[in-house]
């Protein structure tokens, strides 16, 4: 039947994915790609294609560096000068609205506890690289905020996949700081839309480990 054929194709794709050596070190933002479509991700690793830098990626790099500088971070991301020097006026003009949106956000007048804090979390044989854009104190704990210069989640499924990144960040900061997970909130700020997205629920440590083990 057609269903049997589709199931066979899926099993074949998963079998092929298992033959591809996947990286041991994984950016937290890629967790969702493993979970949502491992065969497609494995194919990209099997046949890597050179990618041109996208305007959105460049804008994201510039915006994150600007926020770092605004909060007085001593360490600015490497490579920002080279991006600016290629076409500084055009690059700066393209993020003016992002800056304006940030200045009107609730984050603008807060002092972060952490800015661009990198923490590594190990699950099984893999290490996830978690770079927390900012951490702010709350009344009874902290809130992790991830600045996004791209588009908001298009639906509930998309949001739940993106939220895996926040769940990893929360776990990472819990291990780093010693704070229990329930004292750590996490949210996205989609700067271009001036929109905050805070998932109602984030996976806990055991759930993340189980999900990863099921995926790999």
What are these regions, as identified by a protein language model?
Residues 26, 37, 54-66, 90-93, ...:
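Generic recognition of stable, solvent-exposed alpha-helical segments in well-folded globular domains
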Residues 24, 43-52, 79-83, 147-157:
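Glycine- and acidic
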Residues 38, 45, 65, 117-119, ...:
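Residues immediately flanking
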Residues 46-124, 197:
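A non-catalytic, helix-rich entry segment at domain boundaries
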Residues 171-216:
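Metal-dependent nuclease catalytic regions and adjoining charged, substrate-binding loops involved
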Residues 119-176, 198-199:
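Non-catalytic protein-protein interaction segments used by genome-maintenance enzymes to assemble
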């Amino acid at each position: 039947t057609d269903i049997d054929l589709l199931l066979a194709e899926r099993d074949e794709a998963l079998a092929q994915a298992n033959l591809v050596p996947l990286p041991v070190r994984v950016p937290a933002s890629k967790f969702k790609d493993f979970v949502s479509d491992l065969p497609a991700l494995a194919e990209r690793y099997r046949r890597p294609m050179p990618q041109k830098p996208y305007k959105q990626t460049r804008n994201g790099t510039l915006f994150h560096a600007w926020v770092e500088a605004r909060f007085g971070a001593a360490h600015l991301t490497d490579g920002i000068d080279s991006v600016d020097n290629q076409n500084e006026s055009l690059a700066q003009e393209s993020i003016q609205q992002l800056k304006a949106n940030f200045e009107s956000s609730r984050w603008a007048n807060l002092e972060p506890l952490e800015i661009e804090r990198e923490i590594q979390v190990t699950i099984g044989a893999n290490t996830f690289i978690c770079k927390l854009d900012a951490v702010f104190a709350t009344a009874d704990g902290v809130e992790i905020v991830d600045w996004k210069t791209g588009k908001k989640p298009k639906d509930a499924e998309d949001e739940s996949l993106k939220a895996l990144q926040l769940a990893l960040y929360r776990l990472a900061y819990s291990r780093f700081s010693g704070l229990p997970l329930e004292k750590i909130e996490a949210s996205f700020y989609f700067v271009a839309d001036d929109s905050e997205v805070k998932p109602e629920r984030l996976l806990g440590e055991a759930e993340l480990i189980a999900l990863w083990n099921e995926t790999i």
